[in-house]
UniProtKB/Swiss-Prot annotation:
GO (cellular component) term, any one: cytosol
Biological or metabolic pathway of the protein: Purine metabolism; IMP biosynthesis via de novo pathway; 5-formamido-1-(5-phospho-D-ribosyl)imidazole-4-carboxamide from 5-amino-1-(5-phospho-D-ribosyl)imidazole-4-carboxamide (10-formyl THF route): step 1/1; Purine metabolism; IMP biosynthesis via de novo pathway; IMP from 5-formamido-1-(5-phospho-D-ribosyl)imidazole-4-carboxamide: step 1/1
Family under the similarity heading: Belongs to the PurH family.
Name of the protein in its database record: Bifunctional purine biosynthesis protein PurH
Signal peptide: none
Species lineage: Bacteria, Pseudomonadati, Pseudomonadota, Gammaproteobacteria, Enterobacterales
Provenance organism: Salmonella typhi
GN (gene name): purH
Length: 529
């Protein structure tokens, strides 16, 4: 749909002034009359642009420390006036049509994120006039263009040049969608913030409610439609958060390969989050959201080789994540050895990409290096509701471990215990992980009985010819009975790391002592469902 509308008059009022000077210059050069407010007007005037202050246009001054600037009939009449229908009344009241509104809002999110931000500070950064203009212009998109993102400035000028100073209805409608998304996200942030302040605001407590407001408003941006969801009869799409600061599958750049599937994204997230736990060069291989092989070494090539040995059968068609740049030697080893769905690493060398390009279906993603983990929320949908919790960023240090057995672990056992404890955090419960010399030996995942997870881990190790004797065993939660320790002893496990906390801890510790096993308590559980 063309339905072009010329842009003859624009109102500019922005908090984020990135690119606004150049955009205003481009509009002015194309004969567009500029209206503006406050700091934006002063900035444009300083740059020599012909700009009319809104207060001069309306004949009504800004007041109440800038709280009232644009809330005036001459402004909103000019925005909401329907061309060809409201012309007479606009002329009667000396209301000039405004064809474009360029607005972004007070930085509420940045304000409340600052340490020590008071409720009064937050309140003063709630924009009133801005959202009102945005919604007015978006409502009247048939006649008015609303611009809320500086990333649209260049495209708008190009379209105006291609259409003799006009914008099409398709463009105005797309801009209106962005505008309503913008105000919805803005109001959601304010509602979430105020909802989390309720007890403190009413004097019921000195503390605010915390991370969980009484109404939770979420805004995600669609990154891509999927061919289908977890199964082919389910429709699906991938949505991401705005301004994600941590390297993630959501922010990763796909270098090559087919479009990512729903299951690819879920599994890649599991692999990447696991590999982030390690400081040394590490490799994590994931299948169906569970690690099937993990190792750390002096190079990612050796880490991959050792991770693959844990379970070559399950590694087929898996997801492989690294915490170092993917190099040519490692890429060649993977491509020549196995079928892989996705490779993800902070970066990939040009030589590595030349090698992976020979397998065009292999998806290669780079996510950038990460410095730290960013606290956030995890969500789990249930029928009729949503479970919300903090991300599980907990991880014990060596100094926080408690040895509860008679025998102390050796230095190697301690290293292996810490290693497999990190892996167990990412294995579906009930989770058991055997590890030795910084590589997984066997992984038992997702069993209803913890002792059966232990048995499966030992079976997997035996199937691959890996020696369990002398390995460490991690359990994501406490052992309710001694049978898990007896099963571990039967295959030669020499050290067990677990949270502790069972009413039968004494029996479990006694079993470890009976078998000469060193037992370590973390006092931290890592259920994963």
């Amino acid at each position: 749909m063309q339905q072009r509308r010329p842009v003859r008059r624009a109102l500019l009022s922005v908090s984020d002034k990135a690119g606004i000077i150049e955009f205003a210059q481009a509009l002015s050069a194309r004969g567009v009359e500029l209206l503006s407010t406050g700091g934006t007007a002063r900035l444009l005037a300083e740059k020599g642009l012909p700009v009319t202050e809104v207060s001069d246009y309306t004949g009504f001054p800004e007041m109440m420390d800038g709280r009232v600037k644009t809330l005036h009939p001459k402004v909103h009449g000019g925005i909401l006036g329907r061309r060809g229908q409201d012309d007479a009344i606009m002329e009667q009241h000396h209301i000039a049509p405004i064809d474009m509104v360029v607005v972004n809002l007070y930085p509420f999110a940045e304000t409340v994120a600052r340490e020590g931000c008071s409720l009064a500070d937050a309140v003063e950064n709630i924009d009133i006039g801005g959202p009102t203009m945005v919604r007015s212009a978006a409502k009247n998109h048939k006649d008015v263009a609303i611009v809320v993102k500086s990333s649209d400035y260049d495209a708008i000028i190009k379209e105006m040049d291609a259409n003799e100073g006009s914008l099409t209805l398709d463009t105005r409608f797309d801009l209106a969608i962005k505008a309503f998304e913008h105000t919805a996200a803005y109001d959601s942030m304010i509602a979430n913030y105020f909802g989390s302040m309720v007890p403190a605001y009413h004097g019921e407590s000195k503390e605010a409610a915390g991370r969980f407001p009484r109404t939770l408003n979420l805004n995600f941006i669609k990154k891509q439609d999927m061919r289908y969801g977890e199964n082919s009869h389910q429709q699906a799409a991938f949505y991401i958060e705005e301004n994600v600061k941590e390297a993630s599958v959501a922010t990763a750049q796909q270098i090559q390969g087919k479009a990512l599937s729903y299951n690819n994204i879920a599994d890649t997230d599991a692999a990447l989050e696991c590999v982030k736990e390690f400081n040394e060069p590490a490799c994590v291989i994931v299948k169906h959201a569970n690690p099937c092989g993990v190792a750390v070494s002096t190079s990612i090539l050796d880490a991959y080789d050792r991770a693959y040995k844990t379970d070559p059968t399950s590694a087929f068609g898996g997801i492989i994540a690294f915490n170092r740049e993917l190099d040519a030697e490692t890429a060649q080893a993977i491509i020549s050895r196995q079928f892989v769905e996705v490779l993800i690493a902070p970066s990939a060398s040009e030589e590595a990409l030349k090698i992976t390009s020979a397998k065009q279906n292999v998806r290669v993603l780079t996510c950038g290096q990460w410095a730290s983990r960013v606290p956030g929320l995890d969500f789990k949908r249930v029928n009729g509701g949503l479970l919300v919790q903090d991300r599980d960023l907990g991880m014990v240090s060596e100094a926080e471990l408690r040895v509860v057995s008679k025998r102390q672990p050796t230095e190697q056992e301690l290293r292996d215990a810490l290693f497999c404890w990190k892996v167990a955090k990412f294995v579906k419960s009930n989770a058991i992980v055997y590890a030795k010399e910084n590589m997984t030996i066997g992984i038992g995942a997702g069993q209803m009985s913890r002792v059966y997870s232990a048995k499966i881990a030992s079976i997997k190790a035996a199937d691959e010819g890996l020696e369990v004797k002398g390995s460490a065993m991690a359990s994501d939660a406490f052992f309710p009975f001694r049978d898990g320790i007896d099963a571990a002893a039967a295959v030669g496990v020499s050290c067990v790391i677990q949270p502790g906390g069972s009413i039968r801890d004494d029996e479990v510790i006694a079993a470890a002592d009976e078998h000469g096993i060193a037992m370590i308590f973390t006092d931290m559980r890592h259920f994963r469902h």
